[in-house]
């Protein structure tokens, strides 16, 4: 039989409970690792005699697609991160659940799973169905008032003893201290990635927060733009226009991310993205950009997206913070960016869908491009050869 929680005292007079709280507030908090905190807590509780067979902690995240993330631990498996979609908050899995009770009332919830009735939530019946005997959820409250549930469950036939319940309930404050900074950092990272893009977000989190924090790099640059947006905006209701823009932006952004690029800007009805040249070389970056355009072309064909044009170029850019001292923007600037902007105009004027510079064309297989003649590019001397990409034939389907 698993013993009740002990109140053992160490050589220096500190109880195990005090040591556990000190670990949560100190080393666990400073680890910055929610998986380590969760697994470490579970292992320590088990050593203290708590018959713990499941520990699940959920934490809110500021993300347009997710409502929460968390960690689930079991004695036979390593602790794993999970995510909870926004849609789940409206489903029967959450509504009326013990987690909802904890989050909305800030009070703990306990239920013996071998004594359930038909009125008890499905989550409890599911756990009982796989052998769990007792369930306890406690509130983990952060300084901003947001409450997250931490769930402890056991398969032990006698369930949790009163001493186990008291010990676990006493973890509310130290567990909050251990997890709050970790959760806030994850939310910050999520927000930065949402509004800046994953690449810029990583730079900002690494400390690139001042005007002039710029690195010189080489990148394949992709600029896409809807055809006929102005006429469309004059005849479409705002809700319909925004829905159309949203579908187009989603198709482009998903394609860019799928190929390892970064969406830097939504410029009216345009999207500016880059694919940094790494040790794999210029060809790899340009090929990734071509694959991204091909994905958008496929989406245009299957999802009835509005017509668009795209321009591609590769070259050196300055990548980082520009703006005023108090209002910064993380983006790319340089001649290469200006060139891709001029190429986008050529695409519109020529009737082509996807065009690229000679520099870009030289980095991809010749079968993907065909010349459409020479054109003056504002800001550059003379005329320069411009190419259409082979994928453009499919983008009008």
Please report, for each region that a protein language model flagged, where it lies by residue.
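Regulatory sensory and allosteric helical modules in signal-transduction proteins
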Residues: 76-133
